[in-house]
Amino acid sequence: MLKFVILLCSIAYVFGAVVPLGMLSQSDGRIVGGVESKIEDFPWQISLQRDGRHYCGGSIYSKNVIITAAHCLRNVVAEELRVRVGSSYWEHGGSLRNISKFQIHESYVEPTKEYDVALLKLDSDLSFNSTIKAIELTNEIPPEYADAIVSGWGETLVPPPGIPDQLRSVDVKIIHREKCASRNFGYGSNIKASMICAYAIGKDSCQGDSGGPLVVNNLLVGVVSWGIDCARPSYPGVYVDVSHVRSLIVSNAESI
């Protein structure tokens, strides 16, 4: 599948076309152009795991609810999933928790990644401390070009191959939906109302970071969703706009 995706990217580049949406959802993600980080600086960060392997990120919303991306939950059941909290390392440390159920946003559209957000319900409550904390949701869209930070685990595009054990983070700038859909960038009408973008030359979230946090001033402003390639010029990372889906997150978290 990976070779097929790379081939599609090459064809798209040569002919100036956009790879079909969903082909490069950032679900097996990596942080590109980032640095090793400690969980104390991102205590809301979790590793979503299946079959003992990290494959998506997420954010702690409350003592028993995690926010992640809807596309991370395709073709899975809750019993297959685990969440590691409180560790800078996806493979060890902290605490590994079971998922009792999950809920995908009712307006999620798989082909376009609209409303690409979901909630996970833990089977027991977390105890908050310096490495395990909830993150507050933003009430509004952050200013254009605001400093933001993305964190997660995954391939770094530099040797050795494979995903790094330690959490990584990268600084990016907020790009509003209207500008992300403009001629300044390559997405056009693929950017929908539920999305926001972030961009920096040579820096990006990528496959495996999906569901993870985009943060401004310690507020969750975005959920890693999709993009064309990773850190590719003119193609910012695309995120769920948390201000756009906040009310439904809050109400569903109370009822899940």
UniProtKB/Swiss-Prot annotation:
Signal peptide extent: 1-22
Leading EC class: hydrolase
Keyword Protease assigned: yes
Domain (Peptidase S1) ranges: 31-254
Gene Ontology molecular function: serine-type endopeptidase activity
Subcellular location: Secreted
Domain of life: Eukaryota
InterPro entries referenced in this protein's UniProt entry, alphabetically: Peptidase_S1, Peptidase_S1_PA, Peptidase_S1_PA_chymotrypsin, Peptidase_S1A, Trypsin_dom, TRYPSIN_HIS, TRYPSIN_SER
Key word Disulfide bond present: yes
CDD domains named among the record's database cross-references: Tryp_SPc
Propeptide stretch(es), residue numbers: 23-30
Active site: H71 (charge relay system), D116 (charge relay system), S210 (charge relay system)
Site annotation Required for specificity: residues: D204
Keywords: Disulfide bond, Hydrolase, Protease, Secreted, Serine protease, Signal, Zymogen
Disulfide bonds: C56-C72, C180-C197, C206-C230
GO cellular-component term (any): extracellular region
Record-listed E.C. numbers: 3.4.21.-
Pfam families the record matches: Trypsin (PF00089)
GO biological process: proteolysis
Function: Specificity, limited to carboxyl side of arginine residue in B-chain of insulin.
Family: Belongs to the peptidase S1 family.
Official protein name in the record: Hypodermin-A
Species assigned in the record: Hypoderma lineatum (Early cattle grub)
